[in-house]
Each structure stands twice: as C-alpha cells, then as structure tokens.
C-alpha cells in the first residue's frame, strides 16, 4: 500500500507541474502572442493550442483532487482536515494544506466558468442565416467575454502559484 501513496505523490507533483505550467504558458506566452496577430489567425491558433490546454487543465485538476485527498489520508489527517481543531491545533501543518485545498477548489470553480464561457459564447458558431447584425452582436459578446477570460486567466495563474507555494511550504518543512 505504501507504493500506492508514493505513486500518488508522483502523480500529484506531475499534475501540479502540468497545471501551473500550462497556466503560465497561457498567460505569459500564448495570450501576448495572440494579441500581436490578426484576429482571424489568432482565433485559429487559439483554438488549436487551446484544445490541448482544455484537456490538460481538467485532467490535472481531477488528478490533483484525487491524489491530494489520498495524500491527506496517507498523512492521517483526512478525518480531521475539515475541523476547526485541525486549523487551530496544527496550524503549521494546516496552513500549506489549506492553501493548496482552497486554491484547488477555486481553480475548479473558475475552470468550470471558463469552460462554460468558451463553449456557450466563444466557440459557438453562427447559423448560415445570420446577418450582419447577428455578426456584430456576436463579435461584441465575444470581445466582452474574452476580456473576462483574460482576467480570469490571471486569477487562475495566481491561484496555481499559491497552490504551488503551499506545496513547497509543506514539503520543505519551513513552517515546522
């Protein structure tokens, strides 16, 4: 059984690297590059590159949740993790673990919002019967949602960085 928990730690760390790395790539490299090219080309590139990110993000979030709770069980704190006593009595252990948990939970929420916005507004195609007015309304809605999406990407990247900080604090033992 010890091998299972060692493997879960490896999967947990790898998933964190994939998630945080893809978020930093999106914010620091992809978005600025897309803003420098014409909108039609930008949309095509974003759709192709984004397809991989839309798989990597949810998959790594799911793996982080699964392996995170397995790690809590392995540490023997899963039963008391959601109690006030754990936060007050074991705060040196609780702070980095809760930082990771809250970041993960918020990333799951914002990731779901991003997916809904993408599917409902950004990726939806207009019908063939659409006129110029429909096209302009669609473009305005896409521009508005794209602005929200860019801000949400910054929030997600910050949350990913905080979760990584929690993991680093926990594994380094700096708070002990």
Segment roles from a protein language model:
Residues 1-176:
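Polytopic transmembrane helical bundles with strong interfacial aromatic enrichment
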